[in-house]
Amino acid sequence: MAEKLIINFDEYTKIVEKLAIQIHKNYNPTVLVGIMRGAAPIIDILSRILKLPIAYIVIQSYSGKGMEDKQGQLMFAREISSLANNEDFNKVLLIDDLSDTGLTPNKSIEWLKNYGPTKDYIKEVKTACLWKKKSSTFEPDFCPVRLDTDPWIVQPTEHYEELSIEEIIKRN
């Protein structure tokens, strides 16, 4: 199993704020598009800071049980979830939590540029993430943390995947 990089909420929000500063100084997107689930909290914070409309694309990667450091085939949802107008998709900032193998951002850009309702409005797609792993072949446009290794990044809410609702009820 890969080494682990454990991130708490304070560290996480500081990294998102650094990403917001990078974006503010270097790009003027018209919409933020988050890759779910990893980008959900990032998009929430960035949209409040940058005052931009948001959209979500849902992608699932299947690699099999017990394969923490492997990525499988990607499956895209049929639609984008957004209240943004089609015209807002002029300058897209596509956001994920991390750049690992590079498969997700590459395939997401391709999918987004071919998505029927907005494809004619998209003039530019740039990318952002919080972490870029050393072995990633994808180079995001904005990334506050570039790692020298390829750790498994344990994000602040990840522990909930290991808890049952019964355990949470007992704690509360």
For every predicted segment, state its role.
Residues 1-172:
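PRPP-associated nucleotide enzymes
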